[in-house]
Amino acid sequence: MSVCTGSALLAKAGLLDGLAATSNKMFFELARSQGDKVDWQESARWVDAGQYVTSSGVSAGTDMALAVIERVFDAELAEQVVNYTEYQWHRQADADPFAQLLNQGVTPS
């Protein structure tokens, strides 16, 4: 699992080649510049590509972690974590309210 701009490091290492991934919208072009063989998803809170799961921002990382718990274990356990942490889970990976921030931050020089 990778949170925020960690996907840029995975991309630079070639670990995301041929896979879908996402990154923080404010640093998206920076991440994209690290992996031209990555299928970058601009409007995703997180992307589950099987072996690698990437999230856009830090709070999206919590949503991603809950989705992984649900996939690996079950929905009941994920809901328990939600309740214990008093967190409002955004379950839809493709419903990113921050997509409009795409490319408004740091770009590679």
Regions found by a protein language model. Give the residues of each.
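Active-site-adjacent pocket-lining segments in enzyme domains
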Residues: M1-S109
